[in-house]
Amino acid sequence: PQGVVVMHPATGVPQRIYQAFAKFLAERGFHTITYDYRGIGASRPKSLRRFAARMRDWALLDAEGVMRWARARYPELSQLAVGHSVGGHAIGLCSADWDVAGVVQVACHTGNSRFIRQRGERWRVELILRGVGPLMARLIGYVPGKRLGLGEDLPGGVAIEWGAWAGMQRYFFDDPTLGAIERFNRVTHPVLVYGFDDDPWATPAAINALTMHFTNTWVERRQIAPAQAGGAVGHMGFFRAQFAATLWPGLVDWLSERAAATRAEAVAA
């Protein structure tokens, strides 16, 4: 095997959505691990009402736990990670990333609606994140995300913290209880960042507002137009099988290069 890749999902997106991509990686020599955050998909309890979970728990407990498990299970292999949207946040926030050879961030950005160009979409996102979502979380104990276009239903605590961060100028970097700036400063592994011209949320400015905090590592940016991809990608499309021939090979090549570099460093040592 070339290495092991942990796939960190987006908000409200169950791991099954990444099945085709995980299979693609596995066929090219990577052990690939997918998982669900607490309260989502296979990690959802029978009832989400008053289920205790915050968005930071997805990063500091779930993402970190899976990455540490991968390291313990495959100690001889290069450790790599792919993060989709909030999955990229999780990698930057958790501590286990110190042992990672490289990370790919796909459509990862700060969740500030001010970066959304379309006025109608900006208002819709603000209404959901800072209004309807937190209100429903407090009233019924969870957020019916499927009805609001947020993917899966969300634990109430996740929605409340998400809404609070969305109201901060620098998103969670302004939350003094999280220490996000210090956490991102600790990242020293190379980072590859994908953005898409037709993504209404992860605009170049929103991506920059996140990646600027990787101050101690090398960040490579790839901004893709629909014509280059062979179709509309948006915020959620990268992991669809239709892009297996156009978008996925470049990502896999980068992971392979990072895995090879890590093996070479180990031999030299």
What are these regions (language model features)?
Residues 82-170:
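Alpha/beta-hydrolase-fold enzymes
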Residues 15-47:
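Conserved alpha/beta-hydrolase
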Residues 187, 193-195:
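Short beta-strand/loop motif that positions the catalytic acidic residue
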Residues 52-73:
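Alpha/beta-hydrolase active-site loop
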